[in-house]
A protein has these predicted regions:
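Short pre-active-site segment immediately N-terminal to redox-active cysteine/selenocysteine motifs
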Residues: 47-49, 54-57, 126
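Short, internal strand/loop/helix patches
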Residues: 98-136
Length: 164
């Protein structure tokens, strides 16, 4: 991974296109939508992706969700949001995650990592963690912890040309 958007007022110094290193391809994985159908990250190829790992019991995850929901609506059809719930069946179940999303009225796409395949592929150690993946399927930036709407927009600007 190449760059971490910051909470500072300054925009990131460069995007992956300006870097001297070879960007890493984002690992593919399978998660499940609310209907139980499998969805792969590779299904999103050709569109930039904001990939967020979260759980309903996580206060920092809950704090950033209103901004994610609002911004996901603004970029619908242009940037894919994959809000991946860490559904381990113990501290987080399908029912608890679905109930939380429903009670808050969030409309962003939620996916369930019931096998921990995605969390393992991305080495998730803490949540929330967000990855910004370009339309070609390469990591551009990441952020660990709860992020503000401004930081989310800075990350999107690194993968979506219309707001760079």
């Amino acid at each position: 991974m190449t760059e971490k958007p910051t909470e500072s007022d300054e925009a990131p110094a460069h995007t992956h296109a300006d870097e001297e290193i070879t960007p890493d391809a984002a690992p593919d994985f399978t998660v499940y939508n609310k209907e139980g159908n499998p969805v792969r990250l590779s299904d999103m190829k050709g569109i930039p992706v904001v990939l967020n790992f979260w759980a309903s019991w996580c206060p920092p995850c809950k704090a950033e969700m209103p901004d994610f929901d609002e911004i996901a609506k603004q970029y619908e059809g242009r940037v894919a949001f994959m809000m991946v719930n860490l559904t381990d069946g113990q501290s987080e179940t399908l029912d608890s995650a679905k109930s939380f999303i429903s009670s808050m009225g969030y409309t962003f796409p939620v996916y369930f990592d019931t096998t921990s395949e995605a969390a393992y592929a991305y080495g998730i150690q803490s949540i929330p963690t967000t990855f910004f993946i370009d339309a070609e399927g390469y990591f551009v930036a990441y952020y660990e912890g709860s992020m503000s709407g401004d930081t989310l927009l800075r990350g999107i600007s690194m993968i979506y040309a219309e707001i760079q």
